[in-house]
């Protein structure tokens, strides 16, 4: 039976990053993933799943050797961010305020994943098993891993990077705290009449926010949060009818659009009660999911990866060191989850006094330079 130092279950963005990081440290690593990412071509349609990548995440991707490959495919830098409910009460962020060329990048998830996968061949100590998936884990001095193909292998530690419905988390007997936001989120890729933009914006509404994320060329990703019933209704429309509905309910800043593709998913919050148990380590969505309000999901996952790699650099893996990783990350992730929930609950109602207060707060926030800069630095991973 093949034996490894670490088995990573899940080869998405976070799983690929942690596998690369451990391979870079010289450990014997196996990565198990069900689907190999498609080869990139410029003619491919944009992935409907995109992420707002922070400076901290770019640093991690550069350290892993993947960022240059990602940039050579397609990324869209953004330099400005605006958020508002009433048009006259806006909070604006600009990269110039921090002396940066851009606040971050909007990048398709599959492009990030593919950029990481392109680095695998550099590490003979990294084995990729794909397509295959986890069937069971048995715990002893090591972990025996059985795959759905019937293959078995052994690892000292298992990293769960297999998403919100993590099998690793279940096999490791790690509980979760979870609730449903009773909202769904629709992602809509559109063609715009404007040239490539450098701004991302979000308008709050009692029924849920509406967001704009620029993509390369004359394209953009729109995010529409609403009740499950409303999102189901939108999902049944033709592209032409949906475009009319979007232009009617989104801010005038959007302009004329053509719908290219769309999809939707329910909003839920999950947080693992432990990040480490039974020789299993959780990272990314396996450990925590967050309201996508600020696009911080994958950035939190990359922060997990950086913290895990840092605490284990040059060390034999031990439960004590892994508890340090858990302490370092669980509180930060909980803080971000709670912050997003606060914004969600504050803006998802139509109570008149609260509406007045929150709009005044947004207008005031735009004037408080030092505080605004600190909030922005935290979101960008600069502190």
Where are these predicted regions, by residue range?
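Conserved Rossmann-like nucleotide-cofactor binding loop
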Residues: 14, 37, 165
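N-terminal Rossmann-like FAD-binding beta1-loop-alpha1 element of flavoenzymes
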Residues: 5-31
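Conserved N-terminal helical subregion
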Residues: 2, 59-63, 73-171, 179-184
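FAD/FMN-dependent oxidoreductases across multiple families
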Residues: 230-319
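N-terminal glycine-rich dinucleotide-binding loop that anchors FAD/FMN and/or NAD(P) in oxidoreductases
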Residues: 46-71
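Conserved FAD-binding catalytic core of PHBH/FMO-like flavoproteins
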Residues: 61, 158-262
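Glycine-rich FAD pyrophosphate-binding loop
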Residues: 23-46
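C-terminal helical "tail/cap" subdomain of flavin- and related membrane-associated enzymes
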Residues: 310-383
């Amino acid at each position: 039976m093949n034996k490894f130092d670490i088995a990573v279950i899940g080869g998405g963005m976070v799983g690929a990053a942690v596998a690369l990081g451990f391979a870079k440290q010289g450990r014997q690593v196996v990565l198990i993933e069900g689907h190999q990412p498609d080869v990139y071509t410029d003619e491919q349609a944009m992935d409907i799943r995109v992420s707002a990548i922070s400076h901290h995440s770019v640093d991690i991707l550069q350290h892993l050797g993947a960022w240059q490959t990602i940039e050579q495919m397609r990324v869209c830098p953004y330099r400005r961010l605006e958020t508002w409910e009433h048009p006259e009460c806006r909070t604006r962020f600009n990269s110039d305020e921090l002396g940066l060329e851009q606040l971050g990048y909007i990048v398709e998830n599959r492009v990030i994943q593919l950029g990481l996968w392109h680095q695998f061949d550099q590490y003979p100590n990294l084995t990729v098993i794909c397509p295959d998936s986890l069937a069971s884990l048995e715990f002893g001095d090591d972990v025996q891993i059985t795959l759905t193909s019937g293959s078995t292998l052994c690892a000292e530690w298992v990293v769960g990077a297999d998403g919100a419905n993590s099998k690793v988390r279940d096999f490791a007997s790690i509980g979760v705290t979870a609730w449903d936001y009773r909202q769904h989120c629709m992602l809509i890729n559109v063609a715009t009449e404007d040239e490539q933009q450098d701004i991302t914006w979000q308008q709050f509404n009692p029924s849920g926010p509406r967001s704009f994320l620029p993509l390369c060329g004359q394209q953009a990703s729109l995010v529409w949060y609403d009740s499950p019933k409303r999102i189901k209704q939108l999902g049944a429309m033709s592209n032409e009818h949906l475009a009319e509905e979007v232009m009617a309910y989104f801010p005038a800043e959007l302009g004329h659009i053509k719908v290219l593709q769309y999809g939707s998913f329910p909003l839920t919050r999950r947080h693992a009660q432990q990040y480490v148990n039974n020789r299993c380590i959780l990272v990314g969505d396996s450990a925590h999911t967050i309201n996508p309000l600020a696009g911080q999901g994958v950035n939190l996952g990359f922060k997990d990866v950086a913290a895990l790699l840092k605490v284990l650099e040059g060390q034999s893996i031990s439960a004590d060191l892994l508890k340090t990783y858990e302490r370092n990350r669980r509180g930060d992730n909980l803080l971000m989850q709670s912050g997003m929930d606060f914004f969600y609950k504050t803006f998802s109602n139509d109570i008149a006094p609260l509406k007045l207060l929150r709009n005044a707060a947004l207008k005031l926030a735009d004037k408080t330079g030092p505080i605004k800069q600190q909030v922005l630095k935290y979101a960008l991973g600069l502190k």
